[in-house]
């Protein structure tokens, strides 16, 4: 019998001073059985950095031809495609062809730097692509089935906290 996904309720109170975006998002987010708590939190962090009304989680790990987070227009065009990890150029190229803007977030420092050294030249041709490295150690301590997070962004840095923990999260732009 297959293990089912864990369903997490996530309340995000976002104050993004860089974009002048102030909103609360009440989300229901599935965590795939093979997904680590740390990777799940990377998805939440990426959502926070890009938060807006029509941003949504997709089926993610289960579907090859969709990103993990996206924003679609009213005419069903993919305006923003967000993916994670050390992706191959083929997937990135496909995403850049289907979406107006593509963001790839990497999060394992050693692996991310090696991957970027190998991919940087190949990926320069994609003008609608941005690649970032998220430095967010121990954020998996925040995970619970019902999360309520305070999210403050200023000068590109995220201050993420719940009732018991707080973390400074930085994002480094690769491309």
Task: Locate the predicted segments by residue.
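Helix-rich interaction surfaces within compact, conserved domain-sized segments
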Residues: 2-32, 103-107, 111-174
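Acidic-basic catalytic patches of nuclease active cores, encompassing PD-(D/E)XK
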Residues: 16-61
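Short, well-ordered coil/turn elements that cap or connect secondary structure elements
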Residues: 52, 97, 124-126
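Long amphipathic N-terminal alpha/beta scaffold segment
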Residues: 56-64, 70-74
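Conserved catalytic cores of phosphodiester-cleaving nucleases, focusing on short active-site segments
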Residues: 69-71, 76-92
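A short acidic, amphipathic alpha-helical/loop segment
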Residues: 91-95, 118
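Short glycine-/polar-rich loops that comprise or flank the Walker A/P-loop
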Residues: 99-101
């Amino acid at each position: 019998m297959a293990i089912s996904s864990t369903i997490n309720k996530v309340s995000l109170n976002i104050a993004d001073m860089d974009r002048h975006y102030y909103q609360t998002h009440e989300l229901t987010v599935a965590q795939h059985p093979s997904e680590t708590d740390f990777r799940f939190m990377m998805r939440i962090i990426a959502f926070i950095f890009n938060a807006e009304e029509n941003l949504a989680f997709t089926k993610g790990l289960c579907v090859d031809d969709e990103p993990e987070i996206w924003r679609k227009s009213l005419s069903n065009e993919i305006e923003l495609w967000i993916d994670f990890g050390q992706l191959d150029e083929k997937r990135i190229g496909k995403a850049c062809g289907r979406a107006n803007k593509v963001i790839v977030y990497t999060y394992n420092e050693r692996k991310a730097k090696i991957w970027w050294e190998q991919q940087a030249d190949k990926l320069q041709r994609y003008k609608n692509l941005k690649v970032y490295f998220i430095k967010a150690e121990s954020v998996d301590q925040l995970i619970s089935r019902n999360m309520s997070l305070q999210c403050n962004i200023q000068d590109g840095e995220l201050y993420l906290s719940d009732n018991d923990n707080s973390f400074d999260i930085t994002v480094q732009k690769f491309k």
